[in-house]
Regions:
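C-terminal non-catalytic regions of proteins with extracellular/luminal or membrane-system context
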Residues: 1-223
Length: 223
């Protein structure tokens, strides 16, 4: 599908209460190393109070009809993030990816906003969240492992034949990690908010669970 228009952070940021001192491309989307782009971004990061770093997987890294052979984001993006973190500790990462990725670099980000596959108007939506105009209320719909080797699929992919082997049985997703006591990067259902919530009057019945949910913060939010 071809979008009618595409908003970018660079285009939209002037509409928000952010004093932007500049933008830099930083890396090639196709994964090639480019020291000129990297140096330009690092120099700009050194001058900034806060860095908003947009990174993730492009349409060539994940797509219908093919399986990824690893869970890493392109190395040139990681190297840029690590280089900027050496000159500026206030990095807000805005991640775009349609599925779980390894995050050995997560400590380089003081905050991390996951946009998944945001679409043509995602830049404005991300800036709404970053500036507090909107409250992030999303929760991870999948577990983010520390590394690919920690996943139950690691031993059986790729298959030697044209078969996909599913050996998890009942232990799909978080059930596997909980049962096997495997440490994860971010658990299923993880997500932060600009407000806080209180659970009370918990009642467990044969048909389900009921409780009273109260927003105890100063901002509207969903839980």
């Amino acid at each position: 599908m071809n979008p009618t228009k595409v908003e970018t952070m660079e285009q939209m940021i002037s509409s928000y209460p952010i004093q932007c001192i500049g933008t830099a491309k930083g890396y090639q989307r196709t994964g090639e190393a480019d020291e000129v782009l990297k140096k330009e971004a690092v120099n700009l990061a050194e001058k900034a109070d806060v860095v908003i770093y947009c990174f993730g997987l492009d349409e060539l890294s994940e797509s219908e009809g093919l399986d990824r052979t690893h869970m890493r984001i392109p190395q040139n993006q990681v190297e840029l993030l690590e280089a900027m973190a050496k000159v500026n500790s206030n990095i807000v990462g805005v991640l775009s990816a349609g599925s779980a990725v390894e995050m050995p670099w997560h400590s380089c980000c003081k905050a991390l906003l996951h946009g998944y596959l945001g679409g043509q108007a995602s830049a404005g939506a991300m800036l709404d969240v970053l500036t507090g105009k909107a409250n992030p209320s999303g929760r991870l719909s999948e577990t983010y492992p520390v590394r690919y080797e920690d996943t139950p699929a690691f031993k059986y992919f790729p298959s030697t034949e044209r078969n996909s082997e599913y050996r998890e049985s009942l232990f799909v997703g978080y059930r596997y990690y909980d049962t096997s006591k495997v440490r994860v990067q971010y658990p299923f259902g993880y997500g932060l908010s600009y407000t806080s919530f209180e659970y009370s009057d918990l009642r467990v019945t044969a048909d389900g669970v009921e409780f009273v949910l109260t927003n105890t913060g100063k901002m509207d939010g969903a839980e």
